[in-house]
UniProtKB/Swiss-Prot annotation:
Superkingdom per UniProt: Bacteria
A cellular component term, taken from the record's GO annotations: cytosol
Protein name (Swiss-Prot/TrEMBL): UPF0301 protein BQ03640
Lineage, uppermost ranks: Bacteria, Pseudomonadati, Pseudomonadota, Alphaproteobacteria, Hyphomicrobiales
Cross-referenced InterPro entries: AlgH-like (IPR003774)
HAMAP family cross-referenced by the UniProt entry: UPF0301
NCBIfam families assigned: PRK00228.1-4 (NF001268)
Family: Belongs to the UPF0301 (AlgH) family.
A family per Pfam: DUF179
C-alpha cells in the first residue's frame, strides 16, 4: 500500500457561496491527493444517476442473473458523482480494513482504490466495512486549487472517517460547516479586508 503526501490530502474542501463553477456549488470535496503536480478529490455530496447494480452490470462484474440476487444493502449502495474529470472511471474511498497492491493510504484509516477488484469485493459483501463509490473526480492543475482557495472559493476543514462515510448526502454541506463552527445561514460570498 502506498501513501500520498501533500498538505491538503485527507482534508475537506467546502465550496463557498460565491463559488463561480456551477459543478461545485454547495459541494463538499474530499482531497485524495495534493502535490506540486496538482490536486485530485472526490465530491462527497452529489449522487450519480446510475445505481450500483447497473454499474456492476455495465462493468461486467456481475451478470443479469446475479443482479437479481444482490442483497438489499448492495442494491441500494449509492454511487456518487465524484467530479467532472474522467466521468466514466470509478473510484472508491474506503476504510483501511481492505487493501490491495493498488490501494493508496490517503489519511489515517482512509484509503483510496480504483480497481475492479474492490467493486467485486463490495458486491460480494467482502469489501471494506465502509466505502464510498464515485464516478469521476475533481482535478486541479498545479497551483489552481491554491488560487481558488486564496480567492475565497473554498474553505478547508479536517474530517473524520465517520463524517466521510455518512450516508445523509443532503445534509453533508451544512454539517461540514457546522463542524467548523460556522452557521450556514451566516456564510456570505464576499470577504472583507482590513
Amino acid at each position: 500500500m502506498k501513501q500520498r503526501d501533500g498538505f491538503l490530502g485527507g482534508q475537506l474542501l467546502i465550496a463557498m457561496p460565491g463559488m463561480n463553477d456551477n459543478r461545485f456549488i454547495r459541494s463538499v470535496v474530499y482531497v485524495c491527493a495534493h502535490s506540486d503536480a496538482g490536486a485530485m478529490g472526490i465530491i462527497l455530496n452529489q449522487l450519480h444517476h446510475i445505481d450500483f447494480p447497473e454499474l456492476l452490470l455495465h462493468l461486467g462484474v456481475i451478470s443479469g442473473v446475479q443482479k437479481k440476487h444482490l442483497s438489499e444493502p448492495i442494491k441500494n449502495f449509492p454511487v456518487r458523482y465524484g467530479g467532472p474529470v474522467d466521468p466514466l472511471r470509478g473510484f472508491v474511498l474506503h476504510s483501511d480494513d481492505y487493501t490491495c497492491k493498488e490501494t493508496v493510504l490517503v489519511a489515517e484509516k482512509i484509503c483510496f482504490t480504483a480497481t475492479i477488484d474492490i467493486l467485486k469485493a463490495i458486491s460480494c459483501e467482502q469489501g471494506p466495512q465502509h466505502a464510498l463509490i464515485a464516478l469521476g473526480y475533481a482535478g486541479w492543475k498545479p497551483g489552481q486549487l491554491e488560487t481558488e482557495i486564496s480567492t475565497n472559493g473554498w474553505l478547508i476543514s479536517p474530517t473524520s472517517p465517520s463524517f466521510l462515510f455518512e450516508s445523509d448526502l443532503s445534509r453533508k454541506y451544512d454539517e461540514s460547516l457546522i463542524r467548523m463552527g460556522i452557521n450556514p445561514t451566516y456564510l456570505v460570498s464576499e470577504m472583507g479586508h482590513a
